């Protein structure tokens, strides 16, 4: 975007785009406006990540889309000349291109967390927090895209405003004391959970457990508190879609020690 809109430069003429998220579609639009013609789009999953009908946009622009595919190798000397790609049917194909545009599988910009004493959640790539936004050191709060990759500006704004209110409440000594809390374990195709720990306290904090799956899945989401079922629902989910579980609906006993969040896919 900086090359095209700020410097008026074309970094390539025939790029291969990896990813089919919303930002990937934005890249197609930016290329189109600049007279750049992408040669193809690759997606490792069996369908586009962006919601339908937005996922139709590349095809309407004449850009082929390859699903269940992956980038194997980039060829070229001095600059990109081609890419070797494994397609969905197992064939390896050489696609001529002069650039590779990586537009998916983002991670949070959590460098400061990695360099600090704060606990990092390997699943989300962000700091571990409780339902009040407090990190492992409760003097620090976190919100927005630091907590997980790819969240909308609107959601991040509302979450940041909510966490700011909780921070103010903490300064007034209105939040419960920080504690190790209830550990949350996820299984099945669940990719991440935010927050990563809970306090069994009625003080309002973030309203939901925020979950995401790593692949398209249908089945039942089941939550157990110390082995006892407390919440269950039939769901169909896609990658990078926000999946919300209302914390108030869990009604966790105050002595709860462990929360299991399991996605039982159809057939299991």
Language model segments and positions:
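Glycine-rich Rossmann-fold phosphate-binding loop(s) that bind the pyrophosphate
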Residues: 19-23
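Beta-strand-enriched, solvent-exposed domains that form extended recognition/catalytic surfaces
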Residues: 180-268
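Phosphate-coordination loops involved in phosphoryl transfer and adenosine-cofactor binding
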Residues: 11-14, 68, 77, 137
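Short hydrophobic segments within beta-strands
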Residues: 18, 41-42, 143
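FAD-site-proximal beta/loop scaffold in flavoenzymes
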Residues: 1-4, 99-150
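A conserved FAD-binding loop/helix module that cradles the flavin
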Residues: 143-195, 263, 267-268
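A Rossmann-like FAD-binding core segment of flavoenzymes
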Residues: 25, 32-114, 119, 205-236
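A short, basic/flexible loop-to-alpha-helix module at the beginning of a structural domain
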Residues: 2-12
């Amino acid at each position: 975007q900086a090359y095209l809109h700020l410097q008026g430069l074309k970094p390539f003429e025939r790029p291969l785009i990896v990813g089919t998220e919303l930002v990937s579609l934005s890249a197609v639009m930016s290329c189109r406006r600049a007279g750049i013609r992408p040669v193809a789009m690759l997606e490792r999953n069996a369908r586009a990540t962006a919601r339908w009908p937005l996922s139709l946009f590349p095809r309407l622009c004449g850009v082929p889309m390859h699903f269940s595919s992956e980038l194997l190798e980039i060829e070229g000397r001095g600059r990109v000349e081609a890419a070797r790609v494994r397609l969905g049917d197992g064939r390896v194909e050489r696609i001529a291109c002069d650039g590779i545009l990586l537009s998916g599988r983002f991670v949070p910009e959590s460098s400061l967390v990695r360099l600090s004493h704060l606990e990092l959640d390997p699943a989300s790539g962000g700091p571990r927090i409780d339902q009040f936004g407090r990190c492992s050191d409760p003097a620090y709060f976190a919100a927005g895209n630091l907590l997980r990759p790819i969240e909308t500006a609107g959601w991040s704004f509302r979450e940041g405003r909510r966490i700011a209110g909780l921070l103010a409440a903490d300064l007034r000594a209105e939040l419960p004391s920080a504690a190790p809390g209830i550990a949350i374990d996820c299984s099945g195709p669940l990719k991440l959970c935010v927050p990563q720990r809970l306090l069994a306290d009625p003080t309002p904090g973030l309203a939901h457990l925020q979950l995401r799956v790593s692949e398209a899945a249908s089945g039942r989401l089941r939550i157990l508190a110390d082995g006892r079922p407390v919440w269950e629902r039939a769901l169909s989910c896609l990658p990078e879609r926000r999946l919300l579980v209302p914390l108030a609906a869990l009604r966790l006993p105050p002595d709860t020690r462990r929360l299991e969040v399991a996605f039982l896919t159809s057939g299991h």
